[in-house]
Regions:
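Glycine-rich and polybasic anion-binding loops at the starts of cofactor/ligand-binding domains
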Residues: 2-186
């Protein structure tokens, strides 16, 4: 019977994380660190959202501030929410072709091991980099079948009524502190 230490050693937990790298930030927009009503308003204004979405975000922020840290999962008490940046836009627009992505973004996905052949095969994907979807491609066959597959910002702009009806219904902001955080600053 293997001991606990042997099992941990076999997991190779002390080796370097193969995806542990960082790319330099070159955002076209970034909020200041910290979470406040001003931060939420700035995100909403930058995205030119309707008033009801701003109200949704502000209510989610109130929920976030009032909820305790969840007890499930790892130790979370050392998170300093005032030092985090909650919104960073790495590009000025969503790209529909892989070739149109900035080279440093392409390099990131290459380093993550997503080969060109897989990118070409999938074609019905969105890729998020920092706070924004920066690449979106949908197979024409899905669109012909009436499938609506959009990044969140585009969905809000193109289908506001549908969006308002369903957004935040699977995991509502009141579910837990982090659901509320996501709803406030997505």
């Amino acid at each position: 019977m293997a001991t606990k230490n042997t099992k941990i050693k076999n997991l190779n937990l002390e080796s370097a994380y193969q995806f542990g790298f960082a790319m330099p930030e070159r955002p076209v927009f970034k909020t200041a660190p910290g979470l406040s009503e001003q931060t939420v308003r700035e995100i909403s204004a930058t995205k030119a959202e309707p008033a009801w979405m701003l109200q949704f975000r502000l209510q989610a922020l109130k929920t976030f501030l009032s909820k305790p840290l969840p007890q499930w999962g790892g130790e979370l008490t050392e998170i300093n929410f005032d030092t985090l940046c909650y919104y960073l836009r790495p590009a000025d627009q969503v790209r529909k072709r892989w070739q149109d992505l900035p080279p440093d973004v392409q390099k990131t996905f290459d380093r993550l091991g997503i080969p060109e052949a897989e990118r070409q095969y999938l074609q019905g994907v969105s890729a998020q980099y920092d706070s924004e979807v920066i690449y979106h491609s949908l197979q024409a066959t899905l669109a012909k079948q009436g499938v609506i597959f959009l990044d969140t910002d585009t969905a809000l702009k193109k289908y506001p009524d549908l969006f308002k009806e369903y957004f935040g219904t699977v995991v509502p902001p009141a579910d837990n502190k982090f659901a509320a955080l996501n709803s406030a600053v997505w």
